[in-house]
Amino acid sequence: LVKGEAGAGKTVLMSSLVDDLLNSEDISFIKDNNYINLIVNHNNQLSVYKEIERKLNWNSGSSLEVAMKPTQFLNALRKEKIKAGVVIVDEGHLLLTAKNQAYLGGNHLIDLLAQSKVVVLVYDDKQIMNKSQIWTDNTFFELEHEANLEGNLIELRNQMRIKANPETVNWIRRIIDDCEIKKLTKDKQYDIRIFDSPFELQKAIKLKNKDQKLGISRLVATYDWPYVEEKKKQDRPKWFVEIGDWKAPWNQQIKPEKKDAKLSWIEQPQTIDEIGSTFTVQGFDLNYAGVIIGPSVKYRNGKIMFDISESKNKGAVQNRKLENGEMKNFGEDLLKNELNVLLTRGVNGLYIYAVDEELQEALKEAIL
C-alpha cells in the first residue's frame, strides 16, 4: 500500500515500477512466473498508460493487455479462467466499493486481492470522488493496519508537482484541509493570482498555454453546471459552464482531430477552449491551472463551506446506502476532495476565479 497526497509522485512511481517489472534483467524472475498488469479506474489516465504500453511494447505475459480498467480486467480474468500475478493499481481511491450496472462484484479491491498473488495499491483518501468509492466499514483500515504490520505500507511525503516554497504549499493545503484562507506572501517561484472575471482568467490561461516549454495549461471547474456525457460526439457543444454573459463548453465536447483522438483530454490541443473537470484532469500535471470555483464552494464567517445543493455532481451528493441499510450523505467531504484535486494540478502556477462573492473577496485579500 503506497499512500501519498496529490502531487507526491505516485503515478511516476507506478509507471516506472511496471516498466521495471516488465523489462529489468535484475527482476526478470518475477515476470517469468507472473503476469504483470496495471489497473486504473480513470479513462484519461488509462489512455496515457495505453500510449506508454504501445510505445514501450509492454507485454503482460498473458493474453490480456497490461493497462486495463478494473471491471474490464476482473471480467477478462473470469472469461480467460486465469489468475493474476502482480497487479499495480494507480489512483486506488477510484476503485468501486459498491456494485453498479457494469460491475456486479461488491468491491474492486477485495476482488483484485482474491484474484492476484500481489497487489500494489496507490491511494489518497482525499481524492475519492464518488459515493460508490467510499469505504463504509472498517475493511480498508484493517488492510492498511495489516500492510503496516508487515512493513508493506509506504508513505510518499514530498510534494513533487507544485514547485512552490513550503509556505505556499501550506496555504493551498489550509484551504483544502482546514477550510481556512490565511494571508500569503508573494512567492517568486509559484504564481498565484485571483482574477476579477472568468473572461480574464480564460485569457490568462490561453496566454500561458501558448508557451508549452514548461507544459500544458488548462481551465478547470468544480462540477456546478449541468453536464451529461453524450454517447456520440455532437456537432457542437451542448453543455456549458456559464457565469453572467461568459460561457465555455464543458470537457470532451469539441471534436479532436483524428490524430489526437486517443490522447488524454489535456493533451488534445482543442481542449484549450473547453473547461476540464476532475473526470479529465485527476492524476495529471498542468503548467498553470486556471480554476473556476463554482457556487458549491462558499465562504461564510471566516470559513470555507460546501453547499451540496449547488453541485451538479450526482455521484458525489446523492446518499449512499450503508451495510445496515441506513442512507448516509458524504457530499461535503466529496466536494472538498473535488476542490483538492483541482487546486493541486498546477506545477508553476494557480489562477483562480470564485463565483461566490465572499470567497472571491477573501482570496483577493489573502494574497499580499
PLM features: residue spans?
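Conserved Walker A/P-loop ATP-binding site and its immediately adjacent core
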Residues: D32-E51
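Conserved RecA-like ASCE ATPase "motif II neighborhood" in helicase/translocase motors
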Residues: L56-Q115, D273-S277, E338
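Signature of the SF2 helicase/ATPase Hel1-core->accessory helical subdomain module
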Residues: I88-L156
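Conserved helicase/translocase motor-coupling segment
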Residues: M129-W135, H145, L149-V169, D177-K303
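Hydrophobic positions on the alpha1 helix immediately C-terminal to the Walker A/P-loop
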Residues: L13, L17
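Conserved lysine of the Walker
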Residues: K10
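C-terminal accessory regions
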Residues: V120, P269-L368
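Hydrophobic anchor at the beta1->P-loop junction of P-loop NTPases
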Residues: V2
